[in-house]
């Protein structure tokens, strides 16, 4: 029966499930704990949790400084409002993300609460398979907690506002207070360390190799994300040991446009299924032409023609400046090339194999190990056939270079949004085609932390709203 798990899970992920609200009892038969009676049904339930995981990298990238609008951006009314940081759009986003993450956590909990009694009925081989599943579930839960913390709590260094997010271990609805940021971080670390240990000892998953599922390397990379969020540089260096190949080659680089189609495991440590509508905001669905793309890249992120990433990361276009002048224009190409060719991607990358390189390089530089940091990042740039960071760049300039290269690599994948917040950097947005600065969001703006949504404010134990946001979010 186990040989049927892989195709079944892929089918379930492709179909997608309608996630329930935090306030609605579990009705999905796949996540009903009483329906989990075997390894196979446990994996079916876990697939529902994977599907519930929010897919908002594009909208978070709009809130960062990854994109600049084109003159067609206004044809999609919600994206320009989000790009302009309107309170209404931020409230809508907070509601979507809060419910999406906690639906995923609820689905994970439905699996975890059933495992102890199920384990006693299984053979030794099935127990190892169940152990692997448990590690996946804990990793997914930790990822949700980390992203909730980054979105709904002030920066980790802000000791004046210690409130984090709600930690939930039960399936049933319950009113709980927000734990502190430190308590949440400790829980995330515990979940990931337990998962990493189990991944190491339990062998391979029962369903074989599937790109939409988590494993040991993904768990370690998420742990590195947690530690860089906390400013634990030595911890980042420690956990990224073994995640980076001794020889960094072009094999890490999605060079072909088709490499963005289905979460290729050569590049993905974790990829998430997406609905076909996911990409509709970045282009105008009715035309499927380059001219219909709503957002372009800022010029500082342009890739050189000889860079191996150019072919798949970039859509080349031309901007008419005036009657006699044009200039090259680079539009985001990840996934978009496929859409322009009328081919819809089925998964998006959430954790990529290249990410530990940039996490480790930053951590090394911050510990004064600048030569090691520069050598590491330049090895990746060399594989990309991109210009290296100069030996003369040290100190703050070296850190700026590393973060700049990280943004060029992961543009549109939401990582920049989290980096700008933890680094305390302002967000600068532009009018179409970078003609002028349209908006600057300083590091201390209340808009940098999403509000606890209205749906959760009925929780009598939730405590104060996030700084700067009205307690009644219906206010204009």
List the predicted regions and their residue ranges.
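Membrane-proximal, proline-rich intrinsically disordered regions
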Residues: 20-64, 240, 303, 388-389, ...
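Short, surface-exposed recognition loops and adjoining beta-strand edges that mediate ligand/DNA contacts
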Residues: 33, 60-74, 154-163, 201-283, ...
